[in-house]
UniProtKB/Swiss-Prot annotation:
Keyword Plastid among record annotations: yes
Name of the encoding gene: ndhF
Organism: Triticum aestivum (Wheat)
Keywords associated with the record: Chloroplast, Membrane, NAD, NADP, Plastid, Plastoquinone, Quinone, Thylakoid, Translocase, Transmembrane, Transmembrane helix, Transport
The keyword Transmembrane helix appears for this protein: yes
One Gene Ontology term from the biological process aspect of the record: electron transport coupled proton transport
Protein name: NAD(P)H-quinone oxidoreductase subunit 5, chloroplastic
Length: 739
């Protein structure tokens, strides 16, 4: 066991040889390296697979072992301060290592097919391999300074990958937005680290936890200063994990290639913020104000993310807001002290969301031959529909991933989300109500994504869409195309006078909501006959989907309670995950309830599943094939006609759509207040610099310049003139001096 721990430091370094080899190849033999570029995918996958084997072995040994601090190198700054670099292996590290390596391997395999025809294939593999290295280094860090170093590397890699297609202005803008937003959090993290170093004189986790256990309860340190420093540390996690109000970068990050969208939102960048809070939770748990603030931010984020996902048309942006909401659940769990539930949901969500993102990439690939390579068309769900006939494997995997995220048993996310909901109700009914209501919203918007993408008919070939030829109910006018005369312009899912609408499209247009259109459709929307249809992707893209499907089906069982001996009327709560986390400090809420009553578990499960099924049902009514059935029964129309508050309900739906489609107006608020405000300040500074500073400088120098210009014409270049003026000046001097 100790022999294995000795070489744990190798895990973050394993992907580096491939990165350096590709770099040297591009410098020394660029032509051969580019011609044989797809060969480099194999060593990238191989080395990360070796890292995964190491991680699994460490995790197995960690179950019955203890945390290991190992120092590799010390840099002595002076006699009083030194920086020690090493690694920390504990259950949290083990979980993250397995998560990063498994998802990373599958994303690399998927990327080989997804990026095969891209000119930046090698550059992409260099970036993504370095991304994995940075994240592996972050989770094995033994102190705050190491975490900050790898934290910045993760941010740098995300900047490069989000702006991978940097020739597209929208992608360049997106990576800048992600960089600037995360700099706010990174600055807070750095200040928090420096603050705790000033308090303790150390950057080691053990010293910080000593403060939490001994000094803070006994008023050994300034509680206000400690709370401020803890808040600054939390600010770093807020930006990295896309929590309100620093969440605005995450939807725009979808401008990068789909594989990196999957990696960012499943196992790397957004997981870094959750990891940081989980690592420092022994410190935060001793500061009740910070814990309450964490839970509040998580609650706001989970609800906000769900509402913003309701009306998105871009499939990747919809999934991005879903990620934001699920990260809010994890943040809420950490804020209420439910450490195990947060990590459990981190695991289950990672595999489910990776499955959904890679599935969306398969959908996008299948749509590009029809609509072109412009993301605002190939990712637009309004142009999809009926894909279940053309890409059945992708459809099946996407459906299972959707149901998992909706919380349908026995899929992965059901177990973790149900645990968070139960703990939130125990902690506060306020948090429980919002979390439970959002669970229903999650089922609604996730099933909406599935139905718009796979249900009905392929809408790209029609100017108006309806699931039945005769029906005008919910005919969808194409985004960006001329709307026919028979279609109501006031609704997204527009109808004739006899139809019913769901969301209003008559909204203020905000700059930045629409993206620059590049490329063109390869088929005519008005064509009656077309032979272009979507097709299933290659095996290198389907294989990761099938493996992730297995994880989605079975990974949730590690959190299922099993009997460890009766205690009273309950069953001892012992799970594989809790056994795995036994060596960690037992500071979570679960410790207060050593057993769970089976009746209580079933009751909570029934409640959460009922909410999920209700959300699925509502989504199916509005977006599924069932709406033609309800129209034939005149069920919906009779409800609307007999409802005296129809106009009020229409206005409510219009406002909901406007709020969701325009991202809650948060982006436009930031643009007007911060972006335009800072630009106005820079213009004012420029005016002051040129008008005042330059004015004073030029005002002093200008008279001297003018006098010199006048004097230089006096001499004329004649020596006799110089002697004449010299004698005159001497005579005047002597005259005044002698008189």
């Amino acid at each position: 066991m100790e022999h294995t721990y000795q070489y744990a430091w190798v895990i973050p370094l394993l992907p580096l040889p491939v990165i350096m080899s590709m770099g040297f190849g591009l410098i020394l033999i660029p032509t051969a390296t580019k011609n044989l570029r797809r060969i480099w995918a194999f060593p990238s996958v191989l080395l990360l697979s070796i890292a995964m084997v190491f991680s699994v072995q460490l995790s197995i040994q960690q179950i019955n072992g203890s945390s290991i601090y190992q120092y590799l190198w010390s840099w002595t700054v002076n006699n009083d301060f030194s920086l020690e670099f090493g690694y920390l292996i504990d259950p949290l590290t083990s979980i993250m290592l397995i998560l990063i390596t498994t998802v990373g391997i599958l994303v690399l395999i998927y990327s080989d097919g997804y990026m095969s025809h891209d000119e930046g294939y090698l550059r992409f593999f260099v970036y993504i391999s370095f991304f994995n290295t940075s994240m592996l280094g972050l989770v094995t860090s033994s102190n705050l300074i190491q975490i900050y170093f790898f934290w910045e590397l993760v941010g740098m890699c995300s900047y490069l990958l989000i702006g991978f297609w940097f020739t597209r202005p929208i992608a360049a803008s997106a990576c800048q937005k992600a960089f600037v937003t995360n700099r706010v959090g990174d600055f807070g993290l750095l200040l928090g680290i420096l603050g705790f170093f000033w308090i303790t004189g150390s950057l080691e986790f053990r010293d910080l936890f000593k403060i939490a256990n001994n000094w803070i309860p006994n008023n050994g340190v300034n509680s206000l200063l400690t709370t401020l420093c803890a808040f600054l540390l939390f600010l770093g996690a807020v930006a990295k994990s896309a929590q309100f109000p620093l969440h605005v970068w995450l939807p725009d990050a979808m401008e990068g290639p789909t594989p990196i969208s999957a990696l960012i939102q499943a196992a790397t960048m957004v997981a870094a913020g959750i990891f940081l809070l989980a690592r420092l939770l022994p410190l935060f748990i001793s500061l009740p104000l910070i814990m309450s603030f964490i839970s509040l931010v998580g609650t706001i984020t989970l609800f906000l993310g769900a509402t913003l996902a309701l009306a998105q048309r871009d499939i990747k942006r919809s999934l991005a807001y879903s990620t934001m909401s699920q990260l809010g659940y994890m943040m809420l769990a950490l804020g209420i002290g439910s450490y195990q539930a947060a990590l459990f949901h981190l695991i289950t969500h990672a595999y489910s969301k990776a499955l959904l993102f890679l599935g969306s990439g398969s959908v996008i690939h299948s749509m590009e031959p029809l609509v072109g390579y412009s993301p605002d068309k190939s990712q637009n769900m309004v142009l999809m529909g009926g894909l279940r006939k053309y890409i059945p494997i992708t459809r099946t995997t996407f459906l299972w991933g959707t149901l998992s995220l909706c919380g349908i048993p026995p899929l992965a996310c059901f177990w973790s989300k149900d645990e968070i909901l139960s703990n939130s109700w125990l902690y506060s009914p306020f948090f429980g109500i919002i979390a439970s209501f959002t669970a229903g919203l999650t089922a609604f918007y996730m099933f909406r994504i599935y139905l718009l993408t796979f249900d009905g008919y392929l809408r790209v070939h029609f100017q108006n869409y309806s699931s039945t030829k005769e029906s005008s109910l919910y005919s969808i006018s194409l985004w960006g195309k001329r709307i026919p005369k028979g279609v109501n312009r006031d609704f997204v899912l527009s109808t004739t006078k006899s139809g019913v609408s769901f969301f209003s499209q008559n909204i203020p247009k905000i700059q930045g909501n629409t993206r620059n259109r590049i490329g063109s459709f390869t088929t005519s929307f008005g064509a009656k006959n077309t032979f272009a249809y979507p097709h299933e992707t290659g095996n290198t893209m389907l294989f990761p989907l099938l493996i992730l499907l297995l994880f989605t089906l079975f990974i949730g069982f590690i959190g299922i309670s099993f009997d460890n001996g009766g205690i009273g009327n309950g069953i001892a709560e012992l799970t594989i995950l809790s056994k795995w986390l036994t060596p960690s400090i037992n500071f979570t809420q679960e410790s207060s309830n050593s057993f769970v009553n089976s009746y209580e578990f079933i009751t909570n499960a029934i409640s959460s599943v009922t909410l999920a099924i209700f959300g699925l049902f509502i989504a199916y009514i509005f977006y599924g094939s069932a709406y033609s059935f309800f129209q034939n029964l005149d069920l919906i129309n009779s409800f609307y006609k007999g409802n005296p508050k129809k106009e009020f309900l229409d206005q409510v739906k219009k406002n909901i759509y406007s709020w969701s489609y325009n991202r809650g107006y948060i982006d436009i608020f930031y643009t007007r207040v911060f972006t335009l405000g800072i630009r106005g300040l820079t213009e004012l500074t420029e005016f002051f610099d040129k008008g005042v500073i330059y004015g004073i400088t030029n005002g002093v120098g200008l008279p001297s310049f003018c006098i010199g210009e006048e004097i230089k014409y006096v001499g004329g270049g004649r020596i006799s003139s110089y002697l004449f003026f010299f004698l005159c000046y001497v005579s005047l001097f002597l005259f005044f001096f002698l008189s």
